């Protein structure tokens, strides 16, 4: 008995050390990070190092912060536009959806310099979210059944114009123009994308070349109020904004079927909309849609253990 205990002591020590390391790691990052008062965020993206970006849906401004220190400053001042979904690519460029402006913008993520602005479509429109592959950027429109594509040129150079990709197949938009349709989007690879339809709570696998869509079978379940998506391997995180939770879905190898395994919640959630990944944590931004916005309304980013 004593020998068995003696043999187990090194393992116990290792487990204790691992627990202490994880605890210390968690303490290195704040649980919440304040954004400027009145900011009205919607999208979040992580960049190089501990950088993160949060856009203002009210002004189009971009806030740049540090996930470790919680400090930050305005990278792009508001200009009367809008900034919703966003992503940073490996060339440190920030791709930003322009919501009702019908545009997309690409910034230098280091200094905030505008590299290019793309007019994508005319009203009615809501350019909602964006995902990146090595070859292209894909933007969703919550009011038009189509994607907008920025096909990168050689060495990742930005294109002169965007292209429109009509969506066909299983996805069907409601005839009511006020219905909020396709929202968050994530790339499986260069050929396949996944997007969520907010109103129905359905997920769709999209052929990135043809625009053909197939509904992903969730065994009869849905993710209503689905907003931002994050895909890590075959694990898909779906932010359900007004439900104040994040669905964790395990997808099969074909990405045509999946199962909701669990839900992540947090006491600090207040209508989270999008989520990003960095340093072993999810980082969700609170849009606070149910709180009347004022210049003094507070907003923040929440660290979530996956």
List PLM regions with ranges.
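Blade-level signature of beta-propeller repeat domains, shared across WD40, Kelch, NHL, RCC1
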Residues: 274-306
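Structural signal for beta-propeller blades
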Residues: 60-63, 102-104, 145-149, 201-203, ...
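Beta-rich, blade/repeat-based domains predominating
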Residues: 36-52, 78-94, 121-138, 170-193, ...
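Asp-box/WD-like beta-propeller blade repeats and closely related beta-sheet repeat scaffolds
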Residues: 102-146, 167-170
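A short beta-strand motif characteristic of beta-propeller blades
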Residues: 28-35, 70-77, 113-119, 163-176, ...
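Short loop/turn segments that connect beta-strands within beta-propeller blades
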Residues: 66-70, 108-113, 151-156, 207-211, ...
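Bacterial N-terminal signal peptides
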Residues: 10-19
């Amino acid at each position: 008995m004593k020998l068995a205990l003696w043999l187990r002591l090194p393992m116990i020590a290792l487990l204790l050390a691992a627990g202490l390391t994880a605890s210390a790691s968690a303490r290195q990052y704040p649980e919440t990070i304040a954004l400027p008062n009145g900011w009205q965020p919607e999208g979040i993206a992580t960049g190089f190092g501990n950088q993160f970006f949060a856009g203002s849906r009210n002004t189009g401004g971009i806030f740049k912060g540090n996930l470790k220190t919680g400090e930050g400053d305005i990278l792009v001042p508001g200009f009367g536009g809008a900034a919703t979904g966003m992503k940073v690519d490996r060339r440190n460029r920030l791709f930003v959806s322009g919501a009702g402006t019908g545009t997309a913008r690409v910034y230098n993520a280091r200094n905030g310099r505008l590299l290019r602005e793309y007019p994508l479509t005319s009203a009615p429109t809501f350019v909602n979210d964006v995902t990146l592959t090595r070859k292209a950027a894909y933007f969703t429109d919550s009011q038009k059944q189509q994607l907008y594509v920025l096909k990168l040129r050689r060495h990742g150079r930005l294109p002169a114009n965007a292209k429109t990709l009509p969506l066909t197949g299983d996805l069907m938009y409601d005839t009511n123009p006020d219905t909020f349709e396709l929202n968050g989007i994530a790339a499986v690879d260069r050929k396949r994308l996944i997007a969520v339809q907010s109103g129905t709570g359905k997920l769709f696998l999209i052929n990135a070349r043809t625009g053909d869509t197939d509904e992903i079978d969730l065994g009869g379940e849905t993710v209503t109020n689905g907003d931002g998506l994050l895909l890590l391997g075959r694990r898909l995180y779906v932010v359900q904004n007004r439900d104040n939770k994040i669905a964790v879905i395990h997808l099969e190898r074909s990405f045509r079927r999946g199962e909701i395994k669990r839900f992540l919640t947090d006491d600090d959630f207040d209508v989270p909309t999008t989520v990003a990944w960095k340093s072993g944590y999810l980082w969700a931004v609170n849009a606070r849609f149910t709180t009347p916005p004022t210049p003094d309304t507070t907003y923040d980013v929440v660290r979530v253990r996956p």
